[in-house]
């Protein structure tokens, strides 16, 4: 049986108290929310904090404020179930609710939080094993060893970014607010993740993720498509987030009603004359950080979203995707699926156009 190591558990009631505790206790302390990632890692001796600081009772981290026409703020301790069931998110940001609904199982979504999913540890077949298994192979570069078994000749850890919400947040242009005793800062989700399986976040250990800021829903739509072996529980071995913002043929942004809760997009306006003003395709589950496919975006921008452009964007995603043999399924097949899942995501966005 894998047991948790001994640790001190703290329950601050304010953000100021929480960041002071972590500043006072130093690098051997760590924040925890739902614990669905941290506690299994502690049982496997992948992470060994001596002080664990719960942020589940901080009021500011447990609320959603704002409105879609100017953007909303989501507290980092909102559970994934809260996100899936929230009426504002379902109505105005259905891609967020749809992506959150693909995460794990209902029981774990009841505990896991949106902030925890955005800070999820990178994953690898050689790392996500119990201590005895890892010891038998002399550990790995990510923890206690000196070789990346995925690419033994590389000095880099290739553990993959396996969050379902990260590609979506990068695609739609979300921002994250971090707070420490030194102050606070906002960082774009697109600039928050490093292409390194060990040092995978641009976040200091003393910083607390307080909330996520979503942009206004001004004419954009989005979709998230996930590849996994089972229809529940599994992490993505490929995730594709597609974001498209339209303008009319005369260059004006569309006007119309907000998207309903069907599908997984957001935005306003309809009609076959619209061209794409901005687009992003973001791949998750294939590299240490989310992969933005600029070539896919360029295939879409300035043109109507039709079959030819969708095919070109999907082909660009296939070319850019370079998964390694460090998770489920044969990596060559996962590369092939980058094309198919980009097609699915963009066709989903296209299907939302008449709503």
Predicted feature residues:
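C-terminal structural segment of proteins
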Residues: 1-355
């Amino acid at each position: 049986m894998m047991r948790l190591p001994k640790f001190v558990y703290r329950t601050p009631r304010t953000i100021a108290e929480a960041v002071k505790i972590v500043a006072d206790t130093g690098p051997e302390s760590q924040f925890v929310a739902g614990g669905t990632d941290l506690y299994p890692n502690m049982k496997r001796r992948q992470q060994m904090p001596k002080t664990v600081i719960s942020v589940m009772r901080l009021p500011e981290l447990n609320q959603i404020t704002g409105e879609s026409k100017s953007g909303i703020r989501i507290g980092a301790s909102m559970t994934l179930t809260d996100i899936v069931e929230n009426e504002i998110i379902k109505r105005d940001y259905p891609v967020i609710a749809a992506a959150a609904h693909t995460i794990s199982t209902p029981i774990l979504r009841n505990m896991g939080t949106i902030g925890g999913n955005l800070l999820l540890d990178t994953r690898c077949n050689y790392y996500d094993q119990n201590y005895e298994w890892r010891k038998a192979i002399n550990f790995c570069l990510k923890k206690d060893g000196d070789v990346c078994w995925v690419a033994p000749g590389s000095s880099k850890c290739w553990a993959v970014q396996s969050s379902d919400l990260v590609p979506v947040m990068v695609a739609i242009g979300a921002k994250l607010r971090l707070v420490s005793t030194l102050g606070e800062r906002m960082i774009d989700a697109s600039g928050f993740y490093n292409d390194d399986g060990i040092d995978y976040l641009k976040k200091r250990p003393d910083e607390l993720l307080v909330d996520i800021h979503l942009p206004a829903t001004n004419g954009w739509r989005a979709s998230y498509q996930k590849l996994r072996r089972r229809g529940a529980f599994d992490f993505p071995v490929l995730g594709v987030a597609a974001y498209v913002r339209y303008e009319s043929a005369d260059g004006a942004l569309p006007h119309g009603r907000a998207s309903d809760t069907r599908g997984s997009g957001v935005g306003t306006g309809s009609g076959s004359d619209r061209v794409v003003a901005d687009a992003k395709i973001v791949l998750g589950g294939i590299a240490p950080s989310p992969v933005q496919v600029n070539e896919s975006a360029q295939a879409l921008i300035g043109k109507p979203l039709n079959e030819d452009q969708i095919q070109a964007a999907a082909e660009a995603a296939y070319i850019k995707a370079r998964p390694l043999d460090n998770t489920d399924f044969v990596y060559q097949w996962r590369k092939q699926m980058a094309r198919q899942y980009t097609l699915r995501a963009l066709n989903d966005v296209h299907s939302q156009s008449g709503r």
